[in-house]
């Protein structure tokens, strides 16, 4: 008996071709995925470090993670964890960087790179709140979340307090000064927010808080002028005169003393962001950063 040849329908043929393609692709991906498997730890570290030096942060992070997964312990692994956190920071993955740093600090609390990791955590926390989010977060300047920059300040303070002789202490102090002035500017903008809404008691409260918490900041005399303005409207002549006397002695050219329209409220777009710009509400001039003691 003669057997008839078997013919595949177009649908069956397409299914066979598709299955073959998936099998080949899967094998290729598996080969690519496992390309670093079995590579000596020093070679894997060199590969990741080279990628990082070239600015390939994503590739470096992937290679460092593979090294850490394949070799959980050892000096190369410890250094890979440090550089992986840096690669994440440079990639803008600040939350991931902070998580990696926290894991390292918990695992190796006495490691010689601990000062650097606190410093890097400060840099990462400083950048967690993006400018875009600051602008669209809320119109109410008094309800912003300063937890990330405050944590950054604490990280830099840890470097300065615990490791004053480390190579990162000098810049940590500079970063603290910049953050401190930013916090003072935030308080000044909140004060202006209340002045603009004729909330005189609230404005005086925030101005006093600024002066007590951030003395000698670039915004101290604007805060004194805000006190004078608020107390004038509240009918407290004694306190208003005290504010005027302080300005006459220390900032005689302040616009509030000259009867000029003060304060000059930020433009509409800057009302969204208490950190926007570095200009004094009094003069419109850019303020210089002052050293904190």
From Swiss-Prot:
What the entry lists under SUPFAM superfamilies is as follows: TPR-like (SSF48452)
InterPro entries for the chain: BamD, BamD-like, TPR-like_helical_dom_sf
Q: Where is the lipid attached (N-palmitoyl cysteine)?
A: 27
Q: Which residues form the signal peptide?
A: 1-26
Question: Which GO CC terms are listed, alphabetically?
Answer: Bam protein complex
Family per UniProt? Belongs to the BamD family.
What does the record give as the function of this protein?
Part of the outer membrane protein assembly complex, which is involved in assembly and insertion of beta-barrel proteins into the outer membrane.
Under which name does UniProt file this protein? Outer membrane protein assembly factor BamD
Give the organism, scientific name: Xylella fastidiosa (strain Temecula1 / ATCC 700964)
């Amino acid at each position: 008996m003669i057997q008839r040849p078997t013919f595949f329908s177009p649908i069956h043929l397409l299914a066979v071709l598709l299955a073959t393609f998936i099998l080949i692709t899967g094998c290729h991906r598996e080969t690519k995925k496992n390309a670093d498997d079995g590579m000596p730890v020093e070679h894997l570290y060199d590969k990741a470090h080279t990628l990082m030096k070239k600015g390939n942060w994503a590739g470096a992070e992937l290679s460092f993670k593979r090294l850490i997964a394949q070799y959980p312990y050892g000096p190369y692994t410890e250094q890979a964890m440090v550089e992986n956190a840096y690669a994440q920071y440079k990639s803008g993955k600040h939350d991931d960087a902070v998580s990696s740093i926290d894991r390292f600090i918990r695992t190796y609390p006495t490691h010689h790179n601990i000062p650097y990791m606190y410093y890097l955590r400060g840099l990462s926390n400083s950048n967690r709140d993006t400018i875009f989010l600051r602008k669209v977060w809320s119109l109410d300047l008094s309800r912003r979340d300063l937890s990330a920059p405050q944590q950054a300040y604490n990280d830099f303070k840890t470097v300065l307090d615990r490791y004053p002789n480390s190579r990162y202490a000098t810049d940590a102090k500079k970063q603290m000064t910049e953050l401190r002035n930013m916090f003072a500017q935030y308080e000044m903008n909140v004060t202006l927010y209340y002045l603009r809404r004729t909330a005189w008691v609230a404005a005086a409260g925030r101005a006093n808080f600024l002066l007590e918490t951030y003395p000698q900041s670039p915004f101290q005399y604007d805060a004194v002028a805000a006190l004078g303005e608020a107390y004038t409207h509240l009918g407290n002549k004694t306190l208003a005169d005290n504010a005027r006397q302080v300005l006459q002695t220390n900032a005689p050219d302040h616009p509030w003393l000259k009867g000029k329209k003060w304060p000059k409220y930020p433009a509409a777009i800057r009302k969204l962001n208490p950190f926007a710009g570095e200009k004094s509400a009094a003069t419109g001039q850019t303020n210089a950063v002052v050293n904190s003691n």
